[in-house]
């Protein structure tokens, strides 16, 4: 997605080896026009799979996932990292390790929100090692539902997450694929391939 690549190139910042900061448009301050375009692109990519729900993990995945759900005309389910007092029903849960934050979180979804009739599209902001996506896959499987695809805004293609998910048979669509963040330079996958 050209518009996203341009935004990453202009406003993304490599803050450490393997860490890309995009908080000016994706996960701290959000560019609503870009999120709308991202939602449209995910809807175009996945509408044939007929998802009945979009699932994301709080909090950075919410903006692109909401726009994708809106464009697809389906509800958005947000997996929580902490169980709020208002979540009184039984839950589906999975453990997810964050390499960025160096911590393990239990993600939870209230059982009434997913069931075996659902066709779930997973959307997330980043894909690095694949742990967040695999945690969401586990939650969907616990519900007896089907994962119809995984949409990623930015994939760190130099890490194993994309290969891991694709090797398990998931259709993964990444709108931007980063080949390298070495030496503080953002290199897109297409640049390396050509």
From Swiss-Prot:
Q: Where in the cell is it found?
A: Cytoplasm
* Annotated pathway: Purine metabolism; XMP biosynthesis via salvage pathway; XMP from xanthine: step 1/1
EC identifiers of the protein: 2.4.2.22
Reactions mediated catalytically = XMP + diphosphate = xanthine + 5-phospho-alpha-D-ribose 1-diphosphate
The main location class comes to: cytoplasm
According to its UniProt entry, the protein's GO biological process terms are: purine ribonucleoside salvage; xanthine metabolic process; XMP salvage
Q: Which UniProt keywords apply?
A: Cytoplasm, Glycosyltransferase, Purine salvage, Transferase
Source taxon at top rank: Bacteria
All disulfide bonds of the chain are none
Statement: the UniProt record of this protein carries the keyword GTP-binding? no
As one GO molecular function, the record gives: xanthine phosphoribosyltransferase activity
What cellular component GO annotations does this protein have? cytoplasm
Looking at its record, which EC class is this enzyme?
transferase
Q: Where does xanthine bind?
A: 20, 27, 156
**The keyword DNA repair belongs to this UniProt entry's keyword annotation:** no
The residues that the entry says bind 5-phospho-alpha-D-ribose 1-diphosphate are 128-132
Q: What NCBIfam families does the record tag this protein with?
A: PRK09219.1, XPRTase
Q: How does it assemble?
A: Homodimer.
Q: What does this protein do?
A: Converts the preformed base xanthine, a product of nucleic acid breakdown, to xanthosine 5'-monophosphate (XMP), so it can be reused for RNA or DNA synthesis.
**Family as reported in the entry's similarity comment:** Belongs to the purine/pyrimidine phosphoribosyltransferase family. Xpt subfamily.
Q: Per its record, how is this protein called by name?
A: Xanthine phosphoribosyltransferase
